């Protein structure tokens, strides 16, 4: 056996060992064993509070993060309001949306939004879903949400629109919820290689490679919607060109630690 083959086998064995440990351990046990898991879960809790404070979610809405010690599972709160989520509320799921570790608490019904995107987009590690009212008119009218300023440059050439009627079974008259793996996959397919998708008559989903970045994108997509709506009342809107959007995204997303610091301090104040 060559040295390279031996190293590959050893690495694969280590990955399997980590995955086995993670699937057998509770979230708290994983936090005790893996510093990266502890950091991810604690940041996930903080993100729930920030999203609520910034009106990206309300009593409904949720955020997930991929397990840094096992990319085939993710963490998401049990079914409670984002503003009250604590570490002990975090559950672990596989990429089919099944709760792990024998956890029988009630999960979010739309956890398949997260499983669908995280399974199909290995570059995305965190997903947000919410129902911000500023975004809804775009999905209702077919008006494309496009970047109007540098903070929302990640919208690129415009956010795609998920039309659940095209995928709901057995009839197109669904309850509008992404409540099963097939609909989660359909939503992920609509998202494609982008980072933000609108859901007609429902809300939005955002993705990023980190919790901080997906929170940033959620908040500034909502702000973009408000600005774009106002600008459209005044006349022809000058959107960012594809080149401007690409350049602005690269620049602004190097600085997301700054608003994260602000938002964190705001939710930590008594």
Q: Which positions does each model-derived feature cover?
A:
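N-terminal secretory signal peptides that target proteins for export/translocation
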Residues: 1-7
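Hydrophobic alpha-helical segments with strong N-terminal bias
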Residues: 7-10, 115
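Bacterial N-terminal signal peptides
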Residues: 9-20
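Glycine-rich flexible loops
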Residues: 24-270
């Amino acid at each position: 056996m060559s040295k390279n083959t031996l190293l590959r086998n050893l690495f694969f064995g280590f990955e399997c060992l980590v995955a086995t440990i993670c699937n057998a351990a509770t979230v708290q046990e994983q936090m005790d064993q893996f510093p990266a898991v502890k950091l991810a879960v604690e940041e996930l809790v903080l993100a729930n509070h920030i999203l609520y404070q910034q009106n990206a979610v309300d009593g409904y809405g949720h955020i997930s993060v991929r397990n840094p010690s096992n990319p085939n599972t993710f963490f998401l709160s049990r079914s409670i309001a984002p503003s009250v989520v604590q570490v002990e509320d975090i559950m672990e799921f596989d990429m089919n949306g099944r709760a792990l570790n024998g956890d029988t608490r009630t999960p979010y019904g739309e956890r398949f939004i997260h499983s669908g995107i995280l399974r199909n987009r290995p570059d995305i590690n965190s997903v947000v879903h919410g129902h911000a009212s500023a975004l809804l008119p775009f999905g209702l009218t077919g008006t494309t949400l496009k970047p109007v300023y540098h903070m929302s440059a990640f919208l690129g050439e415009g956010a795609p629109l998920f039309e659940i009627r095209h995928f709901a079974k057995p009839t197109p008259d669904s309850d509008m919820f992404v409540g099963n793996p097939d609909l989660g996959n359909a939503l992920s397919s609509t998202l494609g290689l982008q980072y933000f998708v609108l859901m007609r008559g429902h809300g939005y989903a955002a993705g990023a490679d980190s919790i901080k970045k997906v929170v940033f994108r959620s908040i500034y997509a909502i702000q973009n919607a408000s600005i774009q709506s106002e600008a459209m009342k005044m006349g022809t809107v000058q959107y960012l060109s594809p080149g401007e959007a690409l350049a602005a995204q690269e620049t602004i997303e190097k600085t997301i630690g700054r608003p994260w610091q602000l938002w964190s301090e705001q939710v930590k104040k008594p």
